[in-house]
């Protein structure tokens, strides 16, 4: 039986299946490199004991480390236990639909994915971050936004020196320390102006060269759903994600895309416009181990 070679098979002859391994790996790498959740969180290998991928995975995490004791000569050393807790991460299927020209049907499968893989990756990581951070169109039971609400760790006010410290203090009060911030590029001006002046000496809390807030790494979430004036702080050691399965795809020529519209707001009919649509799917898991590990600064809500 001939071996499938994506370099030699036209997309028109292979309209469904797994994304070719090399391109699937590149897409996954691009998602990992650009997703803010994946940049800051910890990955969980979502496989069973035999190494097979699973959509749900139970795991343990270190909630409290072992203690240490002063010991005199000839005295027994006390036994100290670390505190480990059980958690479960659940994956959901994420699909993206990308309409492209019919000419791509004459590309090889490999050539097609070489052209389109950046678009697929961007669609995946934007959607995953919006769900896991902002709780927008979220299939998971958790998100950073939900954690802030559950733990009551929100601070209302403008982005300034004192309010940023107040957000960090919300975590400190619960026994956590922030190790990163999530911001948006729209906050840059406010962050540059977040300065404390004492005795004529101005101390900025934002470092423009390293793009850090209070010495902590800061990433900008590129999303229209991320409001100007919002900052998230957290101990991202309590944020977990998983990628259990390889990517799959399907090509359609006749569908009407109701979730994608043209410049006039009309649904796109592929047949009428001589287009095709790629539907790619990726399984992603998300877990937040402690709501109190996250806090948020947001503008005062309008009455």
Where do the PLM segments sit?
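Extended oligomerization regions of viral-like shell subunits
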Residues: 154-271, 276, 282
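Alpha-helical scaffold segments that mediate packing/assembly in large oligomeric complexes
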Residues: 96-174, 296-303
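A short, structural micro-pattern
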Residues: 53, 81, 92, 175-177, ...
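Short loop/turn segments at secondary-structure transitions that flank enzyme active sites
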Residues: 65-67, 95, 104, 126, ...
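Short helix/loop capping segments that flank catalytic or ligand/cofactor-binding pockets
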Residues: 67-71, 108, 190-193, 287-289
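Structured loops at beta-to-helix junctions and adjacent beta-edge loops in soluble globular domains
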Residues: 49, 60-63, 101, 184-186, ...
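Protruding loop/beta-arch "assembly-hinge" segments enriched in small, turn-prone residues
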Residues: 1-25, 42-43, 266-303
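Assembly/oligomerization interface modules of large self-assembling protein complexes
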Residues: 16-96, 160, 293
